[in-house]
């Protein structure tokens, strides 16, 4: 829809084109890929997404890190147009993915001029990551630069603590 009042939640109509290509039938090599752990190469191979013995893969709409809708497509290499409708009640980010192989960049949906505060758990992870990063890097920072670096890291801590307090979901 071309015009929306940004101050109210809306049903968002998501449209996109997607293509995926798999061999018609699994082979010993594709089975090896499918059965490999996710931390083993080839990491992002589409074969990991094949549904059973079919040539289909799941295409998911993700809102704030959570799958909200799934459709299956035939992975025959053709471009297919898909649509999802989702109710967006608060500012959110949306991506489309074929797990665990590919995903789009996020699309940001703003509601009522509010920032995205989707996941307290994610914000807590980021807050802890600031300390991990500081502990790993502080010994490599020149003494002259250390006060400014400490101030920047402290500001990051405070920002993430505020985001944690403002977060709506788990």
Each language-model region and where it sits:
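C-terminal functional module detector
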Residues: 1-170
């Amino acid at each position: 829809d071309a015009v929306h009042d940004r101050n109210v939640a809306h049903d968002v109509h998501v449209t996109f084109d997607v293509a995926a290509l798999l061999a018609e039938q699994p082979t010993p090599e594709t089975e090896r890929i499918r059965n490999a752990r996710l931390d083993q190469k080839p990491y992002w191979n589409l074969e990991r997404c094949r549904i059973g013995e079919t040539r289909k893969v799941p295409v998911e709409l993700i809102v704030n890190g959570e799958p909200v809708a799934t459709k299956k497509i035939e992975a025959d290499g053709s471009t297919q147009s898909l649509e999802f409708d989702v109710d967006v009640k608060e500012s959110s980010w949306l991506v489309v993915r074929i797990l665990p192989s590919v995903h789009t960049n996020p699309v940001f949906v703003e509601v009522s001029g509010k920032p995205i505060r989707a996941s307290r758990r994610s914000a807590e992870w980021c807050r802890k990551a600031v300390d991990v990063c500081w502990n790993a890097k502080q010994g490599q920072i020149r003494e002259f630069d250390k006060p400014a670096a400490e101030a920047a890291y402290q500001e990051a801590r405070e920002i993430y603590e505020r985001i944690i307090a403002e977060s709506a979901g788990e």
